[in-house]
Each structure stands twice: as structure tokens, then as C-alpha cells.
Amino acid sequence: GELLRKEEIPTRKDEGGSLILPDISEYIKGVLADMNMTTEDVAGIGMGLPGACLEDGTVNKCINLGWGVFNAANVLSELTGIPVKIGNDANMAALGEFWVGGGSEYNSMVMVTIGTGVGGGVIIDGKPLYGFNGAAGEIGHLPLVEGETESCNCGKKGCLEQVASATGIVRTANRML
């Protein structure tokens, strides 16, 4: 495909994240209108999410978005009228690197992503590894930090994400100031 436009919209996590998919749908409809296109001009939507995702489009919790278990692909497809495929954002990043980036010379690879959270994308023989309940590569919530007093977004204490994510680094720096 050809990238026609790239923008960012705010992620409204209030109301349990229930506004996120409607916001995305409205944004997509606005972009299509701006470009004099219709949903028939779009083959599909691919969306990477920060959490465990199953191949059928079900999100198995996206803690940072406030989501529980539901079929996000079906919901967004119903809102837009366009077929949707979802996946873990770290797996999607790893696939991109595997196809056209630094991993293109290998059959298998692991990619670690660091941002709001910490994730891992695992590619085995050219295919993403999903694992049990879509949790393969979900390294951000491994309990690695002893003595952490604050709870992680997942409710546990001592997760790697609490100190190694961009959010965690800022939190640690603020504590030290």
C-alpha cells in the first residue's frame, strides 16, 4: 500500500477507554471525506494495540487503555464499515522490521519496544508468535524490580514497565528531583 497521510489524534482514556474506537472511526471518516474517498476505496484497517491481542481480533486486556476483553476489530469494523485486523503493537513493529527493516535478513527475530509501556514482538519463521491468550512478548509486566512501592497500571508492583518505559523513567526522575 501507499501511505497517503499521517497524523495523530489524542487518546481519550476517560470513561474506561470507551471513546477511543469511536474517535478513531470519526477521524477515519473525516480523512476519507477530506480526500474525496469512500470506505470502498479502503482495503482494510490495521491497528496495533498495547496489550495482548488474539488472531480473531479480540483484545485480551489493554491495561494502558483501560480495556478489558472484547473484540476490538469487530467494533471498529462496525463503526467504520471497513474490515479491521488488530495485533499487539510490538508485534506489528517487529513485523515491519522483519519485512522492510533491520530484521529483513532473518527468519526469526525479537524486537523490544519502549514507549508508554515496554513490549516485545517475537517473529518465528516469518510469523508473529501470539502465545497463550496473545501474551507472547508481553515483557513489560514481568516482576523484576524489588522494593517498588507504587503500583503499576496492571495493579502489580515491581513490573519492568514501571522503571524501563518512558513513563517510568520520567516518574523515577521526578522522584529523584
Residue ranges, per PLM feature:
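Glycine/GP-enriched mid-protein hinge/lid loop-to-helix segment characteristic of carbohydrate kinases
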Residues: 2-8, 12, 16-19, 77-79, ...
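Glycine-rich His-Gly loop
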Residues: 50-51, 114
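Glycine-rich phosphate-binding loop and adjoining helix at the ATP-binding site
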Residues: 12, 16-25, 29, 33, ...
